[in-house]
């Protein structure tokens, strides 16, 4: 696990019927480590569950962090616990900030596209954009105004930089048809929106599009597929991975302390190095180059036998 810190809940706010915002302070230090907009932390719950949340607070305020938690009816209980039991005074463990999504410093213009709870990584980017005097616009899609977290604050802060799309589909192909030189586009939202963004920006210059995934494949699907085997390079042990179990489960049962947070192939916490064999990738976080030498243990599988650098 990444470096952990003790944190305390000092405020909570019901942003929408399904989204609660928690304000955290460090329990044993004066300030949190520095981060850039778009970073996330992993919260460790009392039962050991680990959940990834974007930091929504201003990076220039290191004395407090804020996260927004969407209550997921089909989740594994982590979001429900935070909604029901994380009262003021509750202590948790949190990882140091992790930066997989960030503003491109070389960009002349930024287009930010969010769907629902996908607005959260952008909330910590907006203060950076304002301080830099940057050229930017924000497109925010939601099923209804009641389900659009932080919408009143965004309208007040952004004015005509904000375009809101309520109960209507944003025409990504039209919006992103002609990338101006120096423009970078960023997207975070439901899988369908992210896929549409990828298709609409397929012709953009390499390195000018950026995606944060909040969903991958369901955990039940990760536990389905053909059986395969893994060889542990350090010991030569052969571990069978049955068709109805994930590689992560098998590795942990064998005593290998592989980290994990989202467990749907989006965060990269459970990446293991592959020395041989053919992985069957199901993640949404690894680049093509990274996939040649690593895989996510939570959702990806293998064909035949894999050799892992463990």
Q: Which residues make up each language-model segment?
A:
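A short, compositionally biased
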Residues: 36-38, 221-228, 266-268
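N-terminal pre-ligand scaffold of iron-sulfur
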Residues: 224-260, 273
């Amino acid at each position: 696990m990444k470096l952990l810190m003790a944190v305390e809940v000092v405020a909570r706010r019901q942003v929408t019927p399904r989204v609660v915002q928690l304000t955290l302070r460090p329990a044993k230090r004066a300030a949190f480590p520095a981060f850039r907009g778009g970073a996330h932390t992993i919260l460790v719950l009392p039962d050991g569950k680990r959940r990834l949340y974007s930091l929504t607070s201003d990076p220039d305020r290191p004395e407090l962090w804020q996260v927004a938690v969407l209550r997921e009816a089909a989740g594994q209980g982590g979001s429900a616990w935070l909604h029901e039991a994380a009262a003021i005074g509750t202590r948790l463990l949190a990882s140091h900030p992790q930066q997989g999504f960030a503003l491109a410093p070389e960009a002349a213009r930024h287009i930010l596209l969010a769907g629902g709870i996908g607005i959260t990584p952008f909330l910590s980017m907006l203060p950076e954009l304002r301080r830099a005097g940057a050229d930017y616009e924000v497109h925010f899609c939601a099923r209804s105004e009641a389900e659009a977290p932080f919408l009143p604050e965004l309208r007040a802060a952004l004015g005509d930089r904000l375009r809101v799309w309520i109960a209507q589909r944003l025409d990504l192909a039209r919006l992103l048809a002609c990338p101006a030189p120096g423009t970078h586009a960023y997207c975070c939202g439901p899988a369908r929106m992210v896929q549409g963004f990828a298709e609409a920006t397929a012709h953009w210059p390499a390195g000018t599009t950026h995606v944060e995934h909040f969903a991958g494949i369901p955990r039940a699907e990760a536990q389905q597929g053909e059986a395969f085997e893994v060889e542990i390079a350090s010991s030569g042990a052969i571990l069978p991975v049955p068709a109805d179990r994930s590689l992560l489960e098998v590795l942990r049962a064998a005593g290998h302390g592989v980290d994990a947070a989202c467990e749907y192939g989006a965060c990269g916490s459970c990446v293991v190095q592959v020395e041989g064999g053919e992985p069957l990738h199901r993640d949404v976080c690894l680049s093509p180059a990274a996939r040649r030498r690593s895989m996510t243990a939570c959702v990806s599988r293998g064909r035949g036998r894999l050799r892992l650098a463990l």
